[in-house]
């Protein structure tokens, strides 16, 4: 049969590497979480790329202050890259997982994501995570949804519900906003200090609107991300995500992502003061 022998060789190497990662993950018990096994976990599940993609969220920081990146001058890009350093964020993620990820969770997730289906999912998820133009991605996702059979739409909805089975997304986004805005206020980035109680009350008023916005955004993102996969694969993914152990894994991974994002936004706010005069919120 035809085909590029170099590409075939590359696929063989990739599967050998994957087999070694899986062997490392399941070979030994997780005591105080072996760092090498956790690093393998980041790779086989794609969670490492998900952590790296947090850096792309830095572009939203000025908007939360009613400003744009250009308001912070030429130093903005350098500052954002320093604060959202991917190596630092992976280290933070590993430190949290080291304390919270147990044997059952690690083994269960690793076994699924090392499967043929799991690796197809990781491939498309990694590609979507690293796509920098969120507006273009959402527009394409919405266009796909408009022409999509309702049956597939419902499977994507079920998938998104399973990814955040604890329903923490809205509260997490609110907490990130609170921590960032308070840090910006304390650092003098804003002209006047923010009252935390008033800020939380204001965010609570918009909670329903935020929930719908996040739901619509997640659905468009799923339509874009999984467009190349058949509905049978998506149904199998939903079943895997709904397993109680996988639900625990995702609850932890979501918490890790949210904590790292909130922490980095706090650090960013503290360092933004040197880039611009005080601004009103």
Which residues make up each language-model segment?
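N-terminal, post-signal-peptide region of Sec/Tat-exported proteins
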Residues: 52-89
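Acidic/His-rich structured neighborhood in mature extracellular/periplasmic domains
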Residues: 79, 83-174
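Sec/Tat signal peptide C-region and signal peptidase I cleavage site
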Residues: 28-32
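Bacterial N-terminal signal peptides
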Residues: 15-25
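A cross-kingdom marker for long, charged
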Residues: 211-281
């Amino acid at each position: 049969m035809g085909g590029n022998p170099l590409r075939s060789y590359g696929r063989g190497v990739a599967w050998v590497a994957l087999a070694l990662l899986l062997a490392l993950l399941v070979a030994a018990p997780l005591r105080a979480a072996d760092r090498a096994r956790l690093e393998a976990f980041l790779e086989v599940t794609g969670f490492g790329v998900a952590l790296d993609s947090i850096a792309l969220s830095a572009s939203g920081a000025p908007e939360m202050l009613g400003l744009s990146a250009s308001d912070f001058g030429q130093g903005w890009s350098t500052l954002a890259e320093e604060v959202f350093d991917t190596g630092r964020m992976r280290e933070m993620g590993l430190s949290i997982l080291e304390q919270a990820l147990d044997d059952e969770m690690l083994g269960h997730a690793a076994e699924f994501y090392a499967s043929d289906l799991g690796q197809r999912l990781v491939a498309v998820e990694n590609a979507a995570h690293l796509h920098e133009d969120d507006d273009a991605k959402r527009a394409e996702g919405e266009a796909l949804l408009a022409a999509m059979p309702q049956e597939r739409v419902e499977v994507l909805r079920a998938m998104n519900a399973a990814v955040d089975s604890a329903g923490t997304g809205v509260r997490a986004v609110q907490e990130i906003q609170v921590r960032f805005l308070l840090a910006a206020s304390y650092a003098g980035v804003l002209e006047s200090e923010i009252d935390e109680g008033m800020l939380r009350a204001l965010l609570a008023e918009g909670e329903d609107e935020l929930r719908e916005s996040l739901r619509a955004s997640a659905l468009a993102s799923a339509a874009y991300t999984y467009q190349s996969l058949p509905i049978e694969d998506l149904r199998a993914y939903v079943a895997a995500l709904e397993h109680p152990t996988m639900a625990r894994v995702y609850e932890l991974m979501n918490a890790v992502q949210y904590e790292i994002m909130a922490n980095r936004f706090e650090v960013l706010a503290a360092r933004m003061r040197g880039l611009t005069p005080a601004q009103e919120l």
